């Protein structure tokens, strides 16, 4: 059985790292309401973002054959228009941005996934509904996207599985 974290004498008790899930399945630390996190894995990598506010992180391995099937079902018309003019990699950048946003909001992928856009007319969007989006330079075969009220308050860790 794992031991509980110890506190220094005279200090408040160390937090518990147990998790619970919100109504749409987003995990959180009930004993640390001041610390938010988002985890993603794809291919041989996993990544975690931690912040003092809600945060969403998504990692996507660039695989073949997903673009048309997924974009026609889950993407906003503006995203589909943008992707018709773009490289295959851009599809994964938009998909990762959309997933990072729904992880940030906690809503998950549902029937509303096509109701918002992560693409401006000529580039990926910099924000959705006031939340900042950032494509994080990572690996040439992956797209990594972060969503938070302020992306400069987020710590990201990643490594191979």
Where do the model's predicted regions map?
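Core catalytic alpha/beta fold that binds nucleotide/phospho-ligands
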Residues: 1-161
């Amino acid at each position: 059985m794992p031991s509980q974290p110890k506190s220094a004498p005279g200090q408040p008790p160390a937090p518990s790292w147990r998790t619970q899930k919100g109504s749409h399945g987003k995990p959180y630390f009930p004993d640390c309401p001041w610390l938010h996190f988002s985890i993603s894995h794809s291919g041989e990598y996993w990544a975690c973002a931690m912040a003092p506010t809600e945060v969403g992180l998504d990692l996507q391995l660039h695989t073949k054959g997903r673009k048309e099937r997924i974009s026609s079902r889950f993407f906003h018309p503006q995203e589909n228009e943008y992707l018709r003019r773009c490289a295959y990699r851009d599809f994964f950048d938009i998909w990762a941005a959309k997933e990072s946003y729904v992880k940030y909001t906690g809503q998950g992928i549902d029937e509303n996934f096509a109701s918002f856009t992560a693409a401006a007319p000529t580039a990926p969007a910099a924000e959705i509904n006031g939340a900042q989006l950032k494509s994080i330079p990572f690996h040439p075969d992956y797209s990594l996207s972060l969503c938070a009220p302020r992306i400069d308050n987020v710590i990201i860790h990643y490594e191979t599985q």
